[in-house]
């Protein structure tokens, strides 16, 4: 019986950290890899790559924990989130706080193996991860904070590899914010009706009937900024083809959200994994000359 309870608790932690749903980690991973490949340029040092890949998983898990902790009193009123570990009682508030601290400490121990500039930047990463979940109570633009949180690995990656944060770094950071606002608005469209009822704010609510148009503008902005990064770094045709393919995926997403149906909006959100992958493959093709 004791093992059964322990096993149930571990499964609850597993759900709380979303390790069964890797999409969030992947959306955090792709911009990190973009930055590492551009900063190097090419394949980054193996240890730095390993630190960032592990750090992505740990910080995404920590972000999920603090997000559910912040939303614990709201999630029970939303059909999609009512069975999450905190509102269902499978995990206590104290356990959630402890798990968050453990995950952050593990991530920080990894960062301590890197240079001083990266260590200093990691403090801002922690602040963004902690602040984001609470922003949806005070502003309709929490997705902007999410974009900054998901993109802060970009300046950290540049700092780790080159001890500098050049123009390309900040253009990529901005592109990631635009991309995150676009895909998280698609995600927020799924819960828009529930969010209005319980007082949660989001760009999906703010944009209203213009949501599809604004998402399209943001997606075009991502493509323009990523193309500018390619030009600044002298990347070859393979990279620009990847931007065109990403544009095709954005068009497909627009088709999916055309009628604002919940399942289709969620499918559009999930499709962004392929956008990140395609852009990374374009970078890899440009730097790896066979």
From Swiss-Prot:
InterPro entries membership: HB_polyprenyltransferase-like, Prenyltransferase, UbiA_prenyltransferase, UbiA_prenylTrfase_CS, UbiA_sf
Matches recorded under Pfam families: UbiA (PF01040)
Pathway stated in the Swiss-Prot or TrEMBL entry: Cofactor biosynthesis; ubiquinone biosynthesis
Transmembrane region(s): 33-53, 99-119, 141-161, 163-183, 213-233, 237-257, 268-288
GO cellular component, one term: plasma membrane
GO biological process: ubiquinone biosynthetic process
GO terms for MF: 4-hydroxybenzoate polyprenyltransferase activity
Cofactor needs: Mg(2+)
Database matches in NCBIfam families: ubiA_proteo
Task of the protein: Catalyzes the prenylation of para-hydroxybenzoate (PHB) with an all-trans polyprenyl group. Mediates the second step in the final reaction sequence of ubiquinone-8 (UQ-8) biosynthesis, which is the condensation of the polyisoprenoid side chain with PHB, generating the first membrane-bound Q intermediate 3-octaprenyl-4-hydroxybenzoate.
Official protein name in the record: 4-hydroxybenzoate octaprenyltransferase
Protein's organism: Escherichia fergusonii (strain ATCC 35469 / DSM 13698 / CCUG 18766 / IAM 14443 / JCM 21226 / LMG 7866 / NBRC 102419 / NCTC 12128 / CDC 0568-73)
Organism ancestry: Bacteria, Pseudomonadati, Pseudomonadota, Gammaproteobacteria, Enterobacterales
């Amino acid at each position: 019986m004791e093992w059964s309870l322990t096993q149930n608790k571990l499964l609850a932690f597993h759900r709380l950290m979303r390790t069964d749903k890797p999409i969030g980690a992947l959306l955090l991973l792709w911009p990190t890899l973009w930055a590492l490949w551009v900063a190097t340029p090419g394949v980054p040092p193996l240890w730095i790559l390993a630190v960032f890949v592990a750090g992505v998983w740990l910080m995404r898990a920590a972000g999920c924990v603090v997000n559910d902790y912040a939303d614990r009193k709201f999630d029970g009123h939303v059909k999609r989130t009512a069975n999450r570990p905190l509102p269902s009682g499978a995990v206590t508030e104290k356990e959630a706080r402890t798990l968050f601290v453990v995950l952050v400490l593990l991530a920080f121990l990894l960062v301590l193996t890197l240079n001083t500039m990266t260590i200093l930047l990691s403090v801002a990463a922690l602040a963004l991860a902690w602040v984001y979940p609470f922003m949806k109570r005070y502003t309709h633009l929490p997705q902007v904070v999410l974009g900054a949180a998901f993109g802060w690995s970009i300046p950290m990656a540049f700092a780790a590899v080159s001890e500098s944060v050049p123009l390309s770094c900040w253009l990529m950071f901005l592109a990631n914010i635009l991309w995150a606002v676009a895909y998280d608005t698609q995600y927020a469209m799924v819960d828009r009706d529930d969010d209005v009822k319980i007082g949660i704010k989001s760009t999906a609510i703010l944009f209203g009937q213009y949501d599809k148009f604004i998402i399209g503008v943001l997606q075009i902005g991502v493509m323009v900024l990523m193309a500018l990064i390619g030009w600044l770094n002298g990347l070859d045709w393979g990279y620009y083809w990847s931007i065109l393919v990403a544009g095709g995926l954005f068009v497909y997403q627009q088709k999916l959200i055309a009628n604002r149906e919940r399942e289709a909006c969620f499918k559009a959100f999930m499709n962004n994994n392929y956008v990140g992958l395609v852009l990374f493959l374009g970078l890899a093709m440009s730097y790896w000359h066979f």
